Swiss-Prot record:
Source organism per UniProt: Photorhabdus laumondii subsp. laumondii (strain DSM 15139 / CIP 105565 / TT01) (Photorhabdus luminescens subsp. laumondii)
InterPro entries: Aminoacid_DH-like_N_sf (IPR046346), NAD(P)-bd_dom_sf (IPR036291), THF_DH/CycHdrlase (IPR000672), THF_DH/CycHdrlase_cat_dom (IPR020630), THF_DH/CycHdrlase_CS (IPR020867), THF_DH/CycHdrlase_NAD-bd_dom (IPR020631)
Pathway, per record: One-carbon metabolism; tetrahydrofolate interconversion
Protein name: Bifunctional protein FolD
Keywords attached to this entry: Amino-acid biosynthesis, Histidine biosynthesis, Hydrolase, Methionine biosynthesis, Multifunctional enzyme, NADP, One-carbon metabolism, Oxidoreductase, Purine biosynthesis
Family to which this protein belongs: Belongs to the tetrahydrofolate dehydrogenase/cyclohydrolase family.
Length: 291
């Protein structure tokens, strides 16, 4: 039986609609709409596409959206100065600096300059530490989005053997923490992993995030497994595919996320959720005064 499709596009739209309702309620009650600042340095075409989708999502849910498009000649000091200004701006609840940054700018220094309570990407050491301590606040967007996909599809993750392919700071490593919270026994594989096929064949839940088209052959998938494909790879003919051989894998898996239309929309929806959360948990005047 073919796998059930995990429709990230529909679930993401539902989440955005839920956030929009909450924003309308806030405004009707005389409170301000959440504010998100999006910073883009340089003219990377892929980054421009991602940033545009995030700005559209902000407008759709009624957020205040501020855009800062900086030239690729921007210095690290200039970027850090902008972040300092946004940290001190009471109308801004979230700051997103689109990665990658141009050569000569230290990604780590920039991300750590964002106040943890405005770190809606969830990359600051404070927020990663909270997730590690099982007391999450603002969680990394893609891992949280995947956890939400599984939850909204009614998939029980407790006791599953979960395997993550890829150990990046953006997906693989924080995803392992999310899956521990979700009750999985979790393995993270990477470029030094031996016998990758063996690990894949043991996975009840497989999450692949390596950025290589059709990296995982479908015949490796354990029958009945849940497959989450994070990869977004554009071929020479313009077609976009994932890291998993979808056609073959979908004949073996019980659930599978497509590319496009799976994880990608959830990353943006989670950014919107995180911005609302930052506003309501950290920055609402009424809440702060009541502490």
């Amino acid at each position: 039986m073919p796998a059930k499709i995990i429709d990230g596009k529909t679930i993401a739209q539902t989440i955005r609609s839920e956030v929009a309702v909450r924003v309308q309620q806030r405004v009707a009650a005389g409170r301000r709409a959440p504010g998100l600042a999006v910073v883009l340095v340089g003219e990377n075409p892929a980054s421009q596409i991602y940033v545009a989708s995030k700005r559209r999502a902000c407008e759709e849910v009624g957020f205040v959206s501020r855009s800062y498009d900086l030239p690729d000649t921007t210095s690290e000091a200039e970027l850090l100065n902008l972040i300092d200004q946004l940290n001190n701006d009471s109308d801004i609840d979230g700051i997103l600096v689109q990665l990658p940054l141009p050569a000569g700018i230290d990604n780590v220094k920039v991300l750590e300059r964002i106040q943890p309570d405005k770190d809606v990407d969830g990359f600051h050491p404070y927020n990663i530490g909270r997730l590690c301590q099982r007391a999450p606040k603002l969680r990394p967007c893609t891992p949280r989005g995947i956890a939400t996909l599984l939850e909204r599809c009614g998939i029980n993750t407790y006791g599953l053997n979960a395997v993550i392919i890829g150990a990046s700071n953006i997906v693989g490593r924080p995803m392992s923490l999310e899956l521990l919270l979700a009750g999985c026994t979790t393995t993270v594989t990477h470029r030094f992993t031996k016998d990758l096929r063996h690990h894949v064949e043991q996975a009840d839940l497989l999450i692949v995030a390596v950025g290589k088209p059709n990296f995982i052959p479908g015949e490796w998938i354990k029958p009945g497994a849940i497959v989450i494909d994070v990869g977004i790879n554009r071929l020479e003919d313009g077609k976009v595919i994932g890291d998993v051989d979808f056609e073959t894998a979908s004949e073996r898996a019980s659930w599978i996320s497509p590319v496009p239309g799976g994880v990608g929309p959830m990353t943006v929806a989670t950014l919107i959720q995180n911005t609302l959360q930052a506003c309501e948990e950290y920055h609402d005047v009424e809440r702060i005064e009541g502490c």
